[in-house]
Amino acid sequence: MKLTLNRILFSGLALSILFTLTGCVGRDAHGNPKGMIWEFLGKPMSYFIDYFANNAGLGYGLAIIIVTIIVRTLILPLGLYQSWKASYQSEKMTFLKPVFEPINKRIKQASSQEEKMAAQTELMAAQRAHGINPLGGIGCLPLLIQMPFFSAMYFAAQYTKGVSTSTFMGIDLGSRSLVLTAIIAALYFFQSWLSMMAVSEEQREQMKTMMYTMPIMMIFMSFSLPAGVGLYWLVGGFFSIIQQLITTYLLKPRLHKQIKEEYAKTPPKAYQSTSSRKDVTPSQNMEQANLPKKIKSNRNAGKQRKR
């Protein structure tokens, strides 16, 4: 159940990223980008790509890389904040495992659907009582703020005039590149592997599918788009690795120490359910309770007939 939910959430998130990148910026009748995101973000990015390519004489390939580095550096704090939230929830779950383990055991050993649902409800209540939100680590707001920048840069790399007719290190930026696609896939696979190293063995088993989902998605997108856009994904892969390294070796150790000190002062207590277990056979009890009344009523009816 939990593994299936994680797969659904991650697959939905991956598809949302793809649709958002193509949906934040609209197109006119001629297929050119338009809309508020393009006007306020995409056009300035396209201008700087053109500036670095022509005025600075760096070429369009290097220009895309430089502008992508600038954009990703500006929004890196949002990505780190998102990682911090997810890591905080993960670390708390690790420390609170002894509290939730008995309830999880009851869920696995439930003999009926009603018993399983009751245990799941109790688990959710216990998580709320200890400040755990299963979806709290996703960090929707930082992700939503980043999406317009991703989308604008995506379209700037694709539609800036001159990109499609240029080359970079022997790669035609207007055509698909198998070499670039392979490098991008390797980068995102390495980033996924790094993220697996930062979690417990149990969580690692649950995240195996997610480890391959992102690289496969990046292969699909990189190979179906021109190499100019692939350079954008390439730089994004390096930044994803940088963000993951900061999360794994800086954020998580600090959070682990912080939460350990918090629970050392106030150790977590086992959750006490406030609701009592209900009788699963209320109809039988009611029938037994009403039985004497029925008998008494029948006796009175017999006396009346004798009279």
From Swiss-Prot:
It is a multi-pass membrane protein. GO terms for biological process: protein insertion into membrane; protein transport. Residues 271-288 have a biased composition (Polar residues). Residues 263-307 are annotated as: Disordered. The chain crosses the membrane at residues 58-78, 135-155, 179-199, 209-225, 231-251. It is found in: Cell membrane. It comes from the Bacteria. Residues 293-307 have a biased composition (Basic residues). CDD domains: 5TM_YidC_Alb3. A lipid is attached at C24 (S-diacylglycerol cysteine). GO terms for molecular function: membrane insertase activity. The keyword Acyltransferase does not apply. InterPro entries: YidC/ALB3/OXA1/COX18 (IPR001708), YidC/Oxa/ALB_C (IPR028055), YidC/YidC1/YidC2_Firmicutes (IPR023060), YidC_ALB_C (IPR047196). PROSITE patterns: PROKAR_LIPOPROTEIN. One of its GO terms (cellular component) is plasma membrane. A lipid is attached at C24 (N-palmitoyl cysteine). Pfam families: 60KD_IMP. Keywords: Cell membrane, Chaperone, Lipoprotein, Membrane, Palmitate, Protein transport, Signal, Transmembrane, Transmembrane helix, Transport. PANTHER family: CYTOCHROME C OXIDASE ASSEMBLY PROTEIN COX18, MITOCHONDRIAL, OXA1. Required for the insertion and/or proper folding and/or complex formation of integral membrane proteins into the membrane. Involved in integration of membrane proteins that insert both dependently and independently of the Sec translocase complex, as well as at least some lipoproteins. Belongs to the OXA1/ALB3/YidC family. Type 2 subfamily. This is Membrane protein insertase YidC 2. The gene is yidC2.
